[in-house]
Regions:
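Flexible, acidic/Gly-rich N-terminal and inter-domain linker regions that tether
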Residues: 1-66
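Residue-level detector of conserved catalytic or cofactor/ligand-binding positions
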Residues: 192-199
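Conserved, mostly hydrophobic/aromatic
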Residues: 58, 110, 167
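Conserved glycine-rich "GG(E/T)P / GGGxP" loop and the immediately following alpha-helix
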Residues: 109-127, 179
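Conserved radical SAM core fold
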Residues: 79, 114-117, 149-151, 169-186
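Canonical radical SAM enzyme core domain
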Residues: 81-93, 120-127, 134-158, 164, ...
Length: 199
């Protein structure tokens, strides 16, 4: 694996671990005397449950942890001084396929900071899922996080390739959202939910 991509993976897996949509996010626990096994974390492997109840391993990563927003509750907020990285669509597709072929994962959990605009970011997420499905014939699980403010068309297209779409409803009330994320629009969060629920 390319060292540059590996470094990006470390940064973006670390940034993704704060999204609690997966059951585990890279717990590290060393083997203890009298105990069996250990866990290895920090590489973006998390566990979730499939519809049939099976526990599946997912590559949990962000496309980028750069963000145009400065939400007080988010580790990836614009003003936070942390290592930043961006994977290209092809880097993430190749990484997913490499992990899948090695049986490290059974699927992908993909989110992203917002760069340029919600539509620009959502279009890149859709391209990852589309390339996995159509170019690489990937039959694993894909969970995409919808970007609040993205167009209905892009959310609908994402639904053609993802097994699951979700959106973070950060704050349920407009006045509270404005206190913690003044650049965000409460309506755009709920519109994303509506777009996802449309047939």
């Amino acid at each position: 694996m390319n060292e540059n991509v590996l470094n990006k993976l470390k940064i973006l897996a670390e940034s993704a671990k704060y999204d609690v949509s997966c059951s585990s996010s890279g717990t590290v626990r060393s083997n203890k005397p009298g105990m069996l096994g250990n866990t290895v974390g920090g590489w973006g492997i998390c566990h979730s449950f499939a519809e049939d109840g099976r526990c599946i391993s997912l590559l949990k990563v962000m496309l980028t942890n750069y963000c145009i927003y400065d939400c007080a509750y988010c580790i990836n907020r614009r003003s936070n001084d942390l290592p930043r990285a961006t994977l290209s669509v092809s880097e993430l597709v190749d990484l997913t396929m490499e992990f899948y072929r090695r049986n490290y994962i059974e699927g992908l959990f993909l989110s992203s900071g917002v760069v340029r605009s919600p539509d620009y970011t959502m279009e890149r997420l859709v391209r990852v899922a589309k390339d996995l499905r159509t170019v690489h014939r990937f039959n694993g699980y894909i969970h995409l996080k919808s970007i609040p403010g993205a167009s209905r068309e892009l959310v609908n297209e994402a639904g053609l390739y993802a097994d699951r779409l979700s959106v973070n409803v950060e704050i349920p009330k407009e006045e509270n959202l404005k206190l913690l994320a003044p650049e965000k629009d409460h309506k755009s969060v709920y519109l994303s939910l509506i777009h996802i629920s449309e047939p």
